[in-house]
UniProtKB/Swiss-Prot annotation:
It comes from the Viruses. Substrate binds at residues 102, 126, 223. Keywords: ATP-binding, DNA synthesis, Early protein, Kinase, Nucleotide-binding, Transferase. The gene is TK. InterPro entries: Herpes_TK (IPR001889), P-loop_NTPase (IPR027417). It comes from Human herpesvirus 2 (strain 333) (HHV-2). Its EC number is 2.7.1.21. The keyword Magnesium does not apply. ATP binds at residues 56-63, 217. GO terms for molecular function: ATP binding; thymidine kinase activity. Homodimer. GO terms for biological process: DNA biosynthetic process; TMP biosynthetic process. This is Thymidine kinase. Used in molecular biology as a selectable marker to identify transfected eukaryotic cells. Used in cancer suicide gene therapy to selectively kill transformed cells. Belongs to the herpesviridae thymidine kinase family.
Length: 376
């Protein structure tokens, strides 16, 4: 069922929302995960942490919305923005990773290199893309306790607003590159197997935007090394739609092993996630990420999925099930998007931290990340 906890959990966000005035009312979905799946554990006297992951296809408006949010809130110690690690991607981890990715796809599309050659480059580049997220998640994880829900939960002592969750580079973009022919399904599942366990209080904000407007926004923005690739745009939009459907499928009782036989291997159009879908019907497995992996490369001679790949799909289900999913309507002004995000935070779930010093350590971690790898 939809989770309605959290009205008292984000006072700074709430105050900014009230100060920003009325909007046109286009907000986003309520969280799709059941309330209380992870009740507060540990010392109830310890402070709470709210983590918000703004994710979705590139060019939809995530960074602009986050910038509007931070500007509205103003400088404060209890809210920290964690940007994309562009300096790591372009300098520290490798040289011009984004340029390498787009050029490799372009060369593959023109027939200048083979799919195998492209896959080698893409897989290596995607490791670079995922490293900052995976490392940061690992350092943060020991500080995250159980979910703090109910009237006794205090307001967050610290809120982190992340530009993307680790699943972007460990699941969504590898899957999109697979759809583009520049990564193998085996490589995609290798990344999935490395997805870290989902910590309590993972509030994931995806988004919807008409494709024509999305393409127009992407064409107008300037990012280092980026090409306007409409085929890739369609692929990544499809993957994020599948992601939203998969979370809802799992949280509404879907079991991929039981439904696997319904897959035929023929891809169909994927329904867009509905921002107002709080506790709707069970999505079909055909409309989830599981459908991408019923392909000959992963099947044994008898037609069954090899056990090793099935175990990876179990990992995928395990990682997605606990997420608190929100869907933001980006088809409005930056201020409208900001206000919609502010309203969404009322339903987000914080967690207790694990030590008295955790809040200070987490704040320092986030600021170090932003300072060291968050530049352009």
């Amino acid at each position: 069922m939809a989770s309605h906890a959290g009205q008292q959990h984000a006072p700074a966000f709430g105050q900014a929302a009230r100060a920003s005035g009325p909007t046109d009312g286009r907000a986003a979905s309520r969280p799709s995960h059941r309330q209380g799946a992870s009740e507060a554990r540990g010392d109830p006297e310890l402070p709470t942490l709210l983590r918000v992951y703004i994710d979705g296809p590139h060019g939809v408006g995530k960074t602009t919305t986050s910038a509007q949010l931070m500007e509205a809130l103003g400088p404060r110690d209890n809210i920290v923005y964690v940007p994309e690690p562009m300096t790591y991607w372009q300098v520290l981890g490798a040289s011009e990773t984004l340029t390498n990715i787009y050029n490799t796809q372009h060369r593959l599309d023109r027939g200048e290199i083979s799919a195998g050659e492209a896959a080698v480059v893409m897989t290596s580049a995607q490791i670079t893309m995922s490293t900052p997220y995976a490392a940061t998640d690992a350092v943060l994880a020991p500080h995250i306790g159980g979910e703090a829900v109910g009237p006794q939960a205090p307001p967050p002592a610290l809120t982190l607003v992340f530009d993307r969750h680790p699943i972007a580079s460990l699941l969504c973009y590898p899957a999109a590159r697979y759809l583009m022919g520049s990564m193998t399904p085996q490589a995609v599942l290798a990344f999935v197997a490395l997805m870290p366990p989902t910590a309590p209080g993972t509030n994931l904000v995806l988004g919807v935007l008409p494709e024509a407007e999305h393409a127009d926004r992407l064409a107008r923005r300037q990012r280092p090394g980026e090409r306007l690739d409409l085929a890739m745009l369609s692929a990544i939009r499809r993957v994020y739609d599948l992601l939203a459907n998969t979370v809802r499928y799992l949280q509404r009782g879907g079991r991929w092993r039981e439904d696997w036989g319904r897959l035929t291997g023929v891809a169909a159009a994927t329904p867009r996630p509905d921002p107002e879908d709080g506790a709707g019907s069970l999505p079909r497995i055909e409309d989830t990420l599981f459908a991408l992996f019923r392909v000959p490369e992963l099947l044994a001679p008898n037609g069954d999925l090899y056990h090793i790949f099935a175990w990876v799909l179990d990992v995928l289900a395990d990682r997605l099930l606990p997420m608190h999913l929100f869907v933001l309507d980006y088809d409005q002004s930056p201020v409208g998007c900001r206000d919609a995000l502010l309203r969404l935070t009322a339903g987000m779930i914080p967690t207790r931290v694990t030590t008295a010093g955790s809040i200070a350590e987490i704040r320092d971690l986030a600021r170090t990340f932003a300072r060291e790898v968050g530049g352009v």
